[in-house]
From Swiss-Prot:
Descriptive protein name: Glutamyl-tRNA(Gln) amidotransferase subunit A
Its EC number(s): 6.3.5.7
Gene behind this protein: gatA
Keywords assigned by UniProt, alphabetized: ATP-binding, Ligase, Nucleotide-binding, Protein biosynthesis
Top-level division of the source organism's lineage: Bacteria
GO terms of biological process kind: translation
Subunit structure of this chain's protein: Heterotrimer of A, B and C subunits.
Protein family (similarity comment): Belongs to the amidase family. GatA subfamily.
GO molecular function: ATP binding; glutaminyl-tRNA synthase (glutamine-hydrolyzing) activity
Length: 487
């Protein structure tokens, strides 16, 4: 691996700003690393090498003239395949959109380009962001760089794997029920799901509009802080965007463990023993450093997954109705009949998991069942929000494992969707409540597979969230040894 890519994100940023390395050198190193390892990892669906090199050369020219767009000018960032980039295919890893080129930039893309970031599209994902393993892509299965026989998590598995394998220092994904945090956990990364409404969804292909949020990946906390500071902010093109003071890195609130009230949960027998061991080790260190641990009763959250899947699939059924082979999506016109065109285009264009969720969502919204399922789920969602409000009247943050297990083997759970859904047991409730949460590295199991710790704070308290993450990074056993050689 090129020596440049052995540098931390902060070192890379400092080297770009001091002139020790050029963007062209950094981008070339990323391209060579992708050539070297992505045949095995399969994080990227496509990369226009000429385009990214041209962008790097333009960045170097700006710096040479003393006119960099920002301190991030020339920094590579990978983009998930459901975030629109003008004149670039945005397929959502689905056959129905395999040739769709977006006519516009997503707001987050515009913000990145304004700061001079070098975009590396497109990373693989579960089709339309529906999955927890990136096995649901119509094109390829992404593998975990720590063990190529295992999944990287999902649905943003391509973005997570690209960062974990040192192909790029930063990446963007989307999180509907854990799709940034869970792959971050399984790939040893920092991954942020921001407060709902703080990052524009304009240009993000919608799965479940009331749950989706774009979030960053990085090996280092500072990478997530910097990306969030760039992509957050009010956007008039997104009606769910919230007007708040612009976040900056200076808003990070350093946290002292002494006096910090930390909400914790009880582990259950189905949780992998090494996950429990790592979690207990963190809690013991927190007690030693003066934190107050408060046991929280999460029994009411046992229904979070069914609530999530009723709401998410209902919104998915509505959002994906536009992909009919006429307005959007590839057309399969075999008989010349309009109804057959709809049926054939969607039958051939959507994969099994997407079809399953469309059917479930359509049923939940159907006459006679709407109140019993969707209406009841929304009422239960409100109760989850109130439960979190009650928790945060007692604690400053909640700590729990991000995932109940480390990365499982490819194909292990594909035939049992319920077991796959349970991988999101601790992440979905955060989306239902619209809260900010982050997965941070919490060491590894005996096989060297990463374990993640989820931090949750009240709405709009990303500054505190980052401060707690920074403090946690100083604890013993939190670091991850990333693989240089991937075979």
């Amino acid at each position: 691996m090129n020596e440049i890519l052995k540098k931390s994100y902060v070192e890379l940023k400092d080297s770009l700003n001091s002139g020790k390395i050029s963007s062209t050198e950094l981008v070339s190193a990323c391209i060579n690393r992708i050539r070297e390892v992505d045949g095995a990892v399969k994080a990227f669906l496509y990369l226009d090498e000429k385009k990214v090199l041209n962008s790097a050369e333009e960045s170097d020219k700006r710096r040479k003239e003393g006119k960099p767009l920002s301190e991030f000018d020339g920094m590579p960032v990978a983009i998930k395949d459901n975030i629109c980039i003008r004149d670039t295919i945005t397929s959502c890893s689905s056959k129905i959109l395999e040739n769709y080129k977006s006519p516009f930039h997503a707001t987050v893309v515009e913000k990145l380009l304004e700061k001079g970031f070098i975009l590396f599209p497109r990373t693989n994902m579960d089709e339309f962001a529906m999955g927890s393993s990136t096995e649901n892509s119509a094109f390829q299965t992404t593998r975990n760089p720590f063990d190529l026989e295992r999944i990287p998590g999902g649905s943003s598995g391509g973005s997570a794997a690209a960062v974990a394998a040192s192909m790029v220092p930063l990446a963007l994904g989307s999180d509907t029920g854990g799709s940034v945090r869970q792959p971050a956990s399984l790939c040893g990364l920092y991954g942020l799901k921001p407060t709902y409404g703080t990052v524009s969804r304009y240009g993000l292909v919608a799965y479940a509009s009331s749950l989706d949020q774009i979030g960053p990946f990085s090996r280092e906390l500072q990478g997530c802080i910097d990306l969030y500071s760039v992509i957050s902010g009010k956007d008039v093109r997104d009606s769910t965007s919230i007007h708040r003071p612009k976040f900056s890195a200076s808003d990070v609130q350093p946290q002292d463990f002494k006096g910090l009230k930390v909400g914790v949960i009880k582990m259950t027998p189905e949780i992998q023993s090494e996950v429990v061991k790592s979690y207990d080790k963190v809690l013991n260190q927190l007690k030693e450093k003066g934190a107050t641990l408060v046991d929280l009763d999460f029994s009411k959250f046992g229904f979070a997954i069914p609530i999530y899947y009723i709401i998410a699939t209902a919104e998915c059924s509505s959002n994906l109705s536009r992909f009919d082979g006429i307005r959007f999506g590839s057309r399969k016109d075999k008989t010349g009949k309009l109804e057959d065109l709809f049926v054939d285009s969607r039958t051939e264009g959507f994969g099994p998991e997407v079809k399953r969720r469309i059917l479930l969502g359509t049923f939940s919204l159907s006459a006679g069942y709407y109140d019993a399922y969707y209406g009841t789920a929304q009422k239960a969602r409100a109760l989850i929000r109130k439960e979190y409000e009650s928790f945060f009247s007692k604690v400053d943050c909640i700590l729990q494992p991000t995932s109940p297990t480390t990365a499982f083997k490819i194909g292990e759970k594909t035939k049992d969707p319920i077991q796959m859904y349970k991988a999101d047991i601790w992440t979905t409730s955060v989306n239902l409540a619209g809260l900010p949460a982050m997965s941070v590295p919490m060491g590894a199991d005996q096989k060297g597979l990463p374990i993640g710790l989820q931090i949750t704070t009240p709405h709009f308290q990303e500054g505190k969230l980052f401060g707690i993450a920074l403090a946690l990074s100083t604890l013993e056993g939190m670091n991850i040894q990333f693989p240089e050689s991937i075979k």
